[in-house]
């Protein structure tokens, strides 16, 4: 879905450049360093430069002014994210749209916005209907969202919507008549299962707007509860005080980490032994020294399960704090060496993953 939105922006830009008799061989797009890997794939596969706006502890979401500094006549779009994979936060699309409107008026460009709402797209309409991040904004021309995240459908289903048919280039539509009728399709692959689409359609009909609202509200409340309990634990500090989506991250307090004999990779290892998949990872560039852990709360994760998770975290901390010597991951961190985190698969066998 992200790739289709990106390709459409690229083709629209290329067509305009061709009509103006201008070069069209150096396209670029602007996104924060909190991007999901699909955008890196898009950049490499279509040979489009990806200009990254760094995230910092002071600026935890995309800074509109910094994004505009990276734009030029070759910019095909700016990509704000709703539900950043790394942090769970939302970029301020309304502020970006306002700043971009002034920028486009000043420069004569017509740089659009593609919203990557992979996670937040199925949260915002139900829990924050007043928030403007969608087609109510002037420069938002396309939105992508994952049905298999908070859309409550099994993998892998993605949706992309355009503000109007005129923003979907004709070159992206392909028709065939050898299947018994004229069939037109927009996509990167032609043959694919319809099970996920049927699953999404079923959920829409079965749950309706109110049903989705209740499911997402419950997930968010559970996430906020875990967030508040994590904040009470001595070793940890939450990355953000806000929980706007049912996912958030935390890290070790710097003063605690200095004397700790363990790392969050060790906590991940301990929790995996109890069946919890709570990943530890480093943040993107400019923040790569921070190792964080992330919790994602989905439908069916109850308050009882949250208490079980919190209990296992507390028990794991108690075990780790009894260590007499530093763990291998702690020693590796001190020597600035690659960290080898331990993971358990369903067969009970341990495997090593380099971080």
Q: Language-model segments: what does each one mean?
A:
Residues 1-174, 179-182, 195:
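Conserved PLP-enzyme active-site core in the AAT-like
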Residues 13, 17, 50, 100, ...:
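Structural signal for hydrophobic packing residues in well-ordered secondary-structure cores
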Residues 1, 31, 35, 188-192, ...:
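Secondary-structure capping and boundary motifs in well-ordered enzyme cores
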Residues 52-58, 106-117, 175-176, 187, ...:
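A generic structural motif
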């Amino acid at each position: 879905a992200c790739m289709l939105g990106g390709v459409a922006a690229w083709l629209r830009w290329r067509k305009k450049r061709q009509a103006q008799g201008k070069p069209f061989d150096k396209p670029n797009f602007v996104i924060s360093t909190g991007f999901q890997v699909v955008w890196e794939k898009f950049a490499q596969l279509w040979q489009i430069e990806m200009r990254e706006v760094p995230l910092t502890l002071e600026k935890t979401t995309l800074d509109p002014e910094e994004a505009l500094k990276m734009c030029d006549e070759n910019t095909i779009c700016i990509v704000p994210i709703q539900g950043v994979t790394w942090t769970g936060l939302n970029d301020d699309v309304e502020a970006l749209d306002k700043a971009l409107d002034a920028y486009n008026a000043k420069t004569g460009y017509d740089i659009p916005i593609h919203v990557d709402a992979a996670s937040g797209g199925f949260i915002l309409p139900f829990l924050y209907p007043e928030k403007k991040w969608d087609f109510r904004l002037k420069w938002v021309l396309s939105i992508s969202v994952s049905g298999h995240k908070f859309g409550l459908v099994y993998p892998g289903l993605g949706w992309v919507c355009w503000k109007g048919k005129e923003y979907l280039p004709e070159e992206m539509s392909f028709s065939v008549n050898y299947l018994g009728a004229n069939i037109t399709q927009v996509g990167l692959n032609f043959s694919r299962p319809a099970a996920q689409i049927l699953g999404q359609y079923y959920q829409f009909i079965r749950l309706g707007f109110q049903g989705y609202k209740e499911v997402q509200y419950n997930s968010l409340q559970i996430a906020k509860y875990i967030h508040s309990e994590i904040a009470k634990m001595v070793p940890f500090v939450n990355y953000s005080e806000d929980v706007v989506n049912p996912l958030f991250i935390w890290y070790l307090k710097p003063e605690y980490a200095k004397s700790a004999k363990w790392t969050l990779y060790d906590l991940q290892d301990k929790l995996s032994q109890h069946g919890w998949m709570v990943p530890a990872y480093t943040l993107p560039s400019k923040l790569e020294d921070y190792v964080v852990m992330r919790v994602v709360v989905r439908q069916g994760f109850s308050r009882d399960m949250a208490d079980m998770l919190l209990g296992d975290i507390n028990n794991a901390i108690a075990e780790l704090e009894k260590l007499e010597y530093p763990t291998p991951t702690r020693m590796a961190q001190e020597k600035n060496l690659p960290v080898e985190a331990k993971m358990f698969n369903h067969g009970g066998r341990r495997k090593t993953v380099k971080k």
